[in-house]
């Protein structure tokens, strides 16, 4: 004898059909407000990324100025600093997306070459720390770039510390 009334299979089928119908009905009503909301969100995200890029580029540019000052004040350090300086220049270019900028010279380097290289190592550490802090707020692509630059900065700081040990006063 066959059961009469509502079966479990029938109840599940009816529930599934109702949910599917409600879901499909929600997909059709596009009145343009969602498009403007998405566009606003994208514009806000682009603004945040541009601000973070500008901040990071300015930080790297300041470091590049420090390298230039040390090389100018102590020409004997130029050969050792050249590859590191070139890398910092490449980082600055990548962050600024080719839009260059200049910064005024900051305070002069230390009174001797050894101290100047030590100060440069400390500046590299600060810059790497700043990029690391910024990458936490950055979108994925910029975060990867900042992570790479921060890692390079940490390596530069180590190399500069070792260079300072070998530099005569």
Task: Label the model's feature ranges.
Residues 2-6, 16, 20-169:
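All-alpha RGS (Regulator of G-protein Signaling) helical domain and cognate RGS-like helical scaffolds
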């Amino acid at each position: 004898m066959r059961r009469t009334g509502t079966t479990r299979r029938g109840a599940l089928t009816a529930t599934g059909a109702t949910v599917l119908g409600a879901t499909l009905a929600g997909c059709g009503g596009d009145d343009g407000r969602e498009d403007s909301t998405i566009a606003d969100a994208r514009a806000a995200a682009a603004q945040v990324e541009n601000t973070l890029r500008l901040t990071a580029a300015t930080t790297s540019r300041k470091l590049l100025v420090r390298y230039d000052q040390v090389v100018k004040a102590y020409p004997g350090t130029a050969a050792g600093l050249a590859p590191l300086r070139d890398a910092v220049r490449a980082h600055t270019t990548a962050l600024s997306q080719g839009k260059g900028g200049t910064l005024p010279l900051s305070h002069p380097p230390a009174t001797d070459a050894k101290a100047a290289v030590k100060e440069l190592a400390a500046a590299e550490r600060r810059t790497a720390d700043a990029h690391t802090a910024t990458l936490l707020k950055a979108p994925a692509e910029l975060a990867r770039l900042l992570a790479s630059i921060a890692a390079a900065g940490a390596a530069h700081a180590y190399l500069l510390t070792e260079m300072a040990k070998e530099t005569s006063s």
